[in-house]
């Protein structure tokens, strides 16, 4: 019986073999469904692994959302996506004149430097006097949608419409004798943004004056005038404006009864023993506030500290006697007073309460921002004043320099920008020289210089 049962089982197994074989081999459509590669989901660990952007968007095509997940930063994502979609539009450097290119999808954007415009920054902008002074050498003004350059008196506008050409041998503001690799400055210094200068050497030259200026060689400060009293000698300075007008400080006029003028000299002993130029008339600003009036009426001392001296006979110009140029108010404010330094000169004391210098001294002084100026001063600083000088270095104008020139050089031309006026002592730490701001008085100066007055006995007037 057992053998029969075994045989029965074997026959049943053999009968079922064809059905089993047919089930092993699947139809092609069904098989393809199993062989298709399905995109695996990113694991949490993978999302935070470095190099994840390569797996997401280089090995495979990704969406912007997936790129954002990889970068975790909107700006980086945007930069990547603009290049990823259609390539880098900035690769050809399409922006001219150092413009900065930013790629976009199907486009790019150029951010132009100041003075340039256009899609590719290809157009040079000289249409604004606020951009490099309109490329004008001297004065710039807007005329409709354009700019117009002009020059100081005694100069001719160049054929290019921008440059200024000296029209004579003694045009204003030009040093006929220039320094030979020598600055009207001092030992080496490094300037900080708040006009505090850091010394490179602890041993300044022993032969430095104004307070700590340098000798102004003959012909290097040709606009310097010296005001002389017959008893006191040189007591103030001035600036030559024209053959018959000299600019000075109003408070100098109150210091003496008799005033004479000397020009073209750098040695005080020669000034006080040589020929003097006679004064015809003196114009003192009618709003000038002397210290005694300031204390009495609670006003700002030395406000409107400006005066003009009219000579009896014209000053003879030479290589040692040249006027400083008179700027326009806008040129002074927007261009000159935004330079780093101005230049002052005089025969004043070599230190506070010290002796006066025997020779003409000159010093570069940095402009000081208005807030620092006002905070540093115990007396009011009005809109008619500005500060210049050093925070901690002992370099300053001093008593006896009053009325003298503060000039600023632009394109090798010296323009008068201030008058030495006042200050708290000389070269004190944290204190600056205070100057009359010339740009406030251009109309007043021009009004006086336009007058054609006959020669009269010496007199003082107020305008």
Swiss-Prot record:
This is Coagulation factor X isoform 2. The modification 4-carboxyglutamate is found at residues 46-47, 54, 56, 59-60, 65-66, 69, 72, 75. It comes from Pseudonaja textilis. Keywords: Blood coagulation, Calcium, Cleavage on pair of basic residues, Disulfide bond, EGF-like domain, Gamma-carboxyglutamic acid, Glycoprotein, Hemostasis, Hydrolase, Hydroxylation, Protease, Repeat, Secreted, Serine protease, Signal, Zymogen. Residues 21-40, 183-209 form a propeptide. PROSITE patterns: ASX_HYDROXYL, EGF_1, EGF_2, EGF_3, EGF_CA, GLA_1, GLA_2, TRYPSIN_DOM. Disulfide bonds join 57-62, 90-101, 95-110, 112-121, 129-140, 136-149, 151-164, 172-325, 216-221, 236-252, 373-387, 398-426. Factor Xa is a vitamin K-dependent glycoprotein that converts prothrombin to thrombin in the presence of factor Va, calcium and phospholipid during blood clotting.
């Amino acid at each position: 019986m057992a053998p029969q049962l075994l045989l029965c089982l074997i026959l049943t197994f053999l009968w079922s073999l064809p059905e089993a074989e047919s089930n092993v081999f699947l139809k092609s459509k069904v098989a393809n469904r199993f062989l298709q590669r399905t995109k695996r989901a990113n694991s949490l660990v993978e999302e935070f692994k470095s190099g994840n952007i390569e797996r997401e968007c280089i090995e495979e095509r990704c969406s912007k959302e997936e790129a954002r997940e990889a970068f975790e930063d909107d700006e980086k994502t945007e930069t990547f996506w603009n290049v990823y979609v259609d390539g880098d539009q900035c690769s050809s450097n399409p922006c001219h004149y150092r413009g900065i290119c930013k790629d976009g999808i199907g486009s790019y954007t150029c951010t132009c430097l100041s003075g340039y415009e256009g899609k590719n920054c290809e157009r040079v902008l000289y249409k604004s006097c606020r951009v490099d002074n309109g490329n004008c050498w001297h004065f710039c003004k807007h005329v409709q949608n354009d700019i117009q350059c002009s020059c100081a008196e005694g100069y001719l506008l160049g054929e290019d419409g921008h440059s200024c050409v000296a029209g004579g041998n003694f045009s204003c503001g030009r040093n006929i004798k220039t320094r030979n690799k020598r600055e009207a400055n001092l030992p080496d210094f490094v300037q900080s943004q708040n006009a505090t200068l850091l010394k490179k050497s602890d041993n300044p030259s022993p032969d430095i004056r104004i307070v700590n200026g340098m000798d102004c060689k003959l012909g290097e400060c040709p606009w310097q005038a010296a005001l002389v009293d017959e008893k006191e000698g040189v007591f103030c300075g001035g600036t030559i404006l024209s053959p018959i007008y000299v600019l000075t400080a109003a408070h100098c006029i109150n210091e003496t009864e008799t005033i004479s003028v000397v020009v073209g000299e750098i040695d005080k002993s020669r000034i006080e023993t040589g020929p003097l130029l006679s004064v015809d008339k003196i114009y003192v600003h009618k709003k000038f506030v002397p210290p005694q009036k300031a204390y009495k009426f609670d006003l700002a001392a030395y406000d409107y500290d400006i005066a003009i001296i009219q000579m009896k006979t014209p000053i003879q110009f030479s290589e040692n006697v040249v006027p400083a140029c008179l700027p326009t108010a806008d040129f002074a404010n927007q261009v000159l007073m935004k330079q780093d330094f101005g230049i002052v000169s005089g025969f004043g004391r070599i230190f506070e309460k010290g002796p006066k210098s025997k020779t003409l001294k000159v010093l570069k002084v940095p402009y000081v921002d208005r807030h620092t100026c006002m905070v540093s001063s115990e007396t009011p600083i009005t809109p008619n004043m500005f500060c210049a000088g050093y925070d901690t270095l002992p370099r300053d104008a001093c008593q006896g320099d009053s009325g003298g020139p503060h000039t600023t050089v632009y394109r090798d031309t010296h323009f008068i920008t201030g008058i030495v006026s006042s200050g708290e002592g000389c070269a004190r730490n944290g204190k600056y020289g205070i100057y009359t701001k010339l740009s406030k008085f251009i109309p007043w100066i021009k009004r006086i210089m336009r007058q054609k007055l006959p020669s009269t006995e010496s007199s003082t007037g107020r305008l």
